[in-house]
Each structure stands twice: as structure tokens, then as C-alpha cells.
Amino acid sequence: MTRKVKAAIIGSGNIGTDLMIKILRHGQHIEMGAMVGIDPASDGLARAQRMGVAITHEGVEGLTRLPVFNEIDVVFDATSAGAHVKNEALLRERKPGLRMIDLTPAAIGPYCIPVVNGDDHLDATNVNMVTCGGQATIPMVAAVSRVAKVHYAEIIASISSKSAGPGTRANIDEFTETTSKAIEVVGGAAKGKAIIVLNPAEPPLMMRDTVYTLSDFADIDQIEESVQRMADAVQAYVPGYRLKQRVQFDRIEADCPIRIPGVGDRMNGLKTSIFLEVEGAAHYLPAYAGNLDIMTSAALRTAEKLAERLLASLVA
């Protein structure tokens, strides 16, 4: 039987529960060790228990008291930015070698977008998965960046209000700050801006994302081809990820410049507009929750690579 790395998930809400189901169904080098929550009545803990996963409703302290804790090598944190700082400190003290995959906007460790820099931080003890909006849009910014210098990138992530749990709602400010920074650090834009919209529409709408970039003038065919290749790469682990329509281009000439607050008063260049839709796999919430699916799929993709590295080191 193939050896697997045991993982614990902190946070038994929407994201944590969806991730658990993905690991149980599709984990190749990762297997569930424990599900951690703070609400003994949470649906996530109840599901985990029914599926034979060790549980605790006593938070990370409870995790350290579980017999399986000694076997845990990877911990996913699907709580909140503030909670992750405390969880990281406590677990790092108890088990310094733990690998933590942070699904909150805390960003203690380096940003990780699997299709852009997924192999760059496999030895880091803590990696940050940015945000759902970041996972959907930063690959597109990077796709433009590898063709032309991007001076400014702005993303708007629209998600169904029903798919946003208390953790997401508590982290709106952190969402915009972390995503904006990652657009620059990982996406390659000189300046980034992120906006999130919680859409209350009924029936719930799928996740929609819009990406605008202002870059140096470049061959639009090359940009379009780069964007399509990147979309295909994301689709390899998020099947519901797709371009909603063809990429649009506008030339902003020097004799008719635009003003971008905080960036420049007389900007010109090539404006690229990319429109995305993310349909979820419906492992936990229905298919409209693509924001859930892209975040947990990216986290699992990252964990599989970390696990491969850990298992290879044991063999060596």
C-alpha cells in the first residue's frame, strides 16, 4: 500500500469540510488524520466523525491531545487570519517541523498559487494560499505579465453570499489587502487592487471574476494565447474554471491617457480585460460555490506536492 502523509484540518466550516471531503475522495499522497473545530454541534465535525476521522471541538489545544497528533505532518488552517497567527505559534511550539498550509489571509508564510509558483516554496514550513479571489485571478495577471510589463492590475471577485461563511465575512479587509499584495508579488503587477462582492442573488450565482490589467503595448495574440494556456493549467485541478468570454483589449494612447489613483495621472498602454467563471465540484456546498472549490483544490494541490517531497526525503 502506498504510504501517505497524515493531515489535520483546523476549521470545520465550509472550507474545512469541503477540503476534508476532497482529501478523503481524491488524496493521493495525503490522508485525513483529524478534523478540528470549536463548535461541538458543527456539521463539519459530525461529517468527519461519520467518515471515521478523529475529531475535537477543543481547537488546536484539543488537536495536540489527540493520539493521532504524533503522526500529523501537515496542518491546513481554514479558520481566520487572526486565529491562524495563534494556531501557528502554538503548533510550532509543540511540533516545530509541522508543515502548515494557510487558507486564511494571514500570510505568515510566502504566497502560493500552484500554477504560478507552486514549486517555489516546497521547503517552507508555512505557505499561504492567498484567497479564493486570488487563486482565481492571479494566474491571469501572471499570464499577462509573462508577455508584457504590467503596471496595474485590478480584480473583482463576486461570490454568492450563501457560500461565504463567518470566517470569510470576518476577513473582508484582510482579503483585499492580501490579494492586492499577492497580485504584485506573484502576479507580477507593479500595483495591485482587489475588490470582493458578496452577491445576495437568489438563486445563488456562480463565482465570477473580472481581471483588468494595464501593461506596456504588446502582441494581443500572444497575450490571448498565454491567458488560454494559464486557464488550461488551472483547469487541471479546478475543472469548473473557465474563461467566460474572449479576452478583450483596448489601446490607451498617450494622447488620451487615463488616471489611476495611487499609480499615475497620465497612464497609457494596453488594457486587457479577462472574464472568468468558477463552477464548484459540489463536494460540500452546491456548484455555485466555486470560490470554495478553487481554494480547497489549490490547497490540496499544494499539499500533494509537499507530501511528495516529504515522502521522497524519507526514502532517501
Curated annotation (Swiss-Prot):
InterPro entries found in the cross-reference section: Acetaldehyde_dehydrogenase (IPR003361), Acetylaldehyde_DH_C (IPR015426), NAD(P)-bd_dom_sf (IPR036291), Semialdehyde_DH_NAD-bd (IPR000534)
One Pfam family recorded for the sequence: AcetDehyd-dimer
Keyword NAD included in the entry's annotation: yes
Documented EC number(s): 1.2.1.10
Reactions performed catalytically: acetaldehyde + NAD(+) + CoA = acetyl-CoA + NADH + H(+)
Coiled coil (UniProt feature): none
Record's keyword annotation contains Signal: no
GO biological process: catabolic process
Catalytic center residues: C132
Amino acids binding NAD(+): S12, G13, N14, I15, S163, A164, G165, P166, G167, T168, R169, A170, N171, N291
Gene3D superfamilies attached to this UniProt entry: Dihydrodipicolinate Reductase, domain 2, NAD(P)-binding Rossmann-like Domain
Molecular function via GO: acetaldehyde dehydrogenase (acetylating) activity; NAD binding
Enzyme class: oxidoreductase
Keywords linked to the UniProt accession: Aromatic hydrocarbons catabolism, NAD, Oxidoreductase
Entry's family note: Belongs to the acetaldehyde dehydrogenase family.
Protein name (record): Acetaldehyde dehydrogenase 1
Native organism: Pseudomonas putida (strain ATCC 700007 / DSM 6899 / JCM 31910 / BCRC 17059 / LMG 24140 / F1)
